[in-house]
Amino acid sequence: MKRFLLWVVGVILGVAVLLGAVMTVSYSFTGEGSRPAADTQFGGQALEANGSCWQVPLLGGQLDKVFASPATLTVQKLGVLYTAHPELSLPDWTCYTALTIQNAAGDVLFAGSAGEYQNFLFPANGEYKAELTAWRVPKDGTITQLRKNLGLERPAKPTGWYRYSFRFTLQASAEVELSAERVEQGGTVGVRISGMTGDAVPAIETDLGSVQCVRAAEGWRAYIPAAYNASSGGHEINITVNGETITRTLTVLPKDFGTVEAEAEEPAADSANAQFRSAIWPLYEAAATAKQWQGGFVPPAEDSMTLVDYGQIKVTNGQQGSRSNSTKLYTIPGAPCRAAANGTVVFAGNLELTGNTVVIDHGCGLRSYLYGLQEISVSKGQTVEKGQAVGALGEELTMDFKLGSRSVNPRLLFQTSGGLFWKENG
């Protein structure tokens, strides 16, 4: 019995010595290379860590080895970056980040996570300093428990952080894209402006009409109308961004819209014209709102017959008259009058000149004007969805789609054709 006990004690001591040796060897041979790679980039350049603290688990987490490198005052110089929003690329292991960005005067312009940085806009070109810390912690762990083996992961993985400090000079220039360089009368051209700093609204000047910019995912968007009566040939488009003017040329191609026999119209009363100007004309120059449509538009009248189409020359008693900036339809009385696309009602009421009238703002300066309804079922300020009834049709419906004050061809909207549908989400 005594021998057996001595043997058991010997085995236990041997195992303990062996485990101790294994732990010693494991601890000794675990170096800084056991830490996760610090593969972090900013603006396409690799960042150099200037401080770190990592807890590397040994023997399945039964033992830890800590590698600590105190943060220094060293600041990495990245030089000149030519993009308005340098991309921050992080290693796959990153769980938590803290980023601060200062201007040359030391004012903190941004303090938040890498995810929040995606929505940050640099106010201007110039010099900046940034500090970034990237952590890896187990699920349910916190950044204050890095030196504790929490046993929250199986198998155990390294936990810790890298710190980066860097300077850079931002020197970004705006980039302008047009959806097309040539457009037929009645069409539209999309404009995308990106690559600029700050939140100043770009200004677009052209003789084709008033053009307003609205915020988009990576900059600004706008739409240029080429109305039925736009002069054919080249038109200068001047885009001014942060004091820099970029010029593009847009060529308008002539289109034959044909003629149509039309009945003579009685001159409207001065009071009717004045009421219309007071109620509707201010909408032409109203501030552009965010884009609301997505995809093609639907015709306001599901079943109809065209009486006068967009751009047609009206012929009365053999005499050619004016060209139509709108489309007049023969419709089924009482049938629903539909919103052509998502939008907000900006006018709903009766006018002496146009009868029951509904105007829907679809964003980016595009509005649909619906005249001659039998009934109105929406009110000003109401949000409507594509295809939603906004009232009941009468015998005739006049529809006019305008970018600002210039009418565009509604057929292209119903066909999902033209600049209004270019890079819709970008």
Annotate each PLM feature.
Residues V358-D361, Q382-G426:
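Conserved, short, structured surface segments that act as functional micro-motifs
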Residues M1-L18:
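N-terminal Sec-pathway targeting helices
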Residues P336-V346, V378-L393:
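Short, well-structured beta-strand-loop connectors
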